[in-house]
């Protein structure tokens, strides 16, 4: 998790955000740099694919990555940052559902919630574009909303 935490710090630094600030000063509150989430939906007859979810939390910020292979074998990675409240990290394998691959991979805003104490679960939602659920290992809890983007890997 140390490498993932360092990757998360670099992601926030690139956007001018210090994820370790305490928000005691109003100018430290940089949530306006992150978009906020859509509402999750359920899909009928949606494809279900295996995915990997990693969440690194910094009290008021979190860094989220989701990896999966589409039906053609192409690997995709979503990477984003969010504002909210939580502590700890979680990493887990789960299921990704979506209605349309093109719609999912164009989604930017998301919400994430997780709870873990030597096991637990997480949900990442792109609203009507897709949802990912995982059981994982780590310790912590959190609820965040933010934005990011998809890219093809490899």
Language-model features, listed with the residues they occupy:
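A membrane-pore/channel beta-structure motif
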Residues: 2-154
């Amino acid at each position: 998790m140390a490498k993932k935490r360092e990757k998360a710090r670099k992601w926030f630094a690139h956007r001018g955000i210090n994820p370790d600030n305490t928000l005691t000063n109003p100018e430290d509150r940089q949530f306006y740099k992150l978009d906020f989430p859509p509402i999750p939906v359920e899909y009928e007859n949606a494809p279900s694919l295996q995915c990997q979810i990693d969440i690194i939390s910094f009290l008021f910020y979190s860094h989220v990555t989701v990896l999966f292979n589409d039906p053609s074998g192409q690997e995709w990675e979503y990477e984003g940052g969010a504002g909210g409240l939580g502590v700890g990290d979680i990493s887990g394998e789960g299921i990704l559902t979506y209605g349309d691959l093109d719609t999912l991979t164009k989604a930017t805003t998301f919400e994430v919630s997780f709870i873990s104490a030597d096991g637990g679960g997480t949900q990442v939602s792109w609203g009507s574009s897709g949802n990912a659920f995982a059981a994982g290992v780590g310790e912590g809890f959190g609820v965040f909303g933010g934005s990011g983007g998809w890219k093809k890997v490899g």
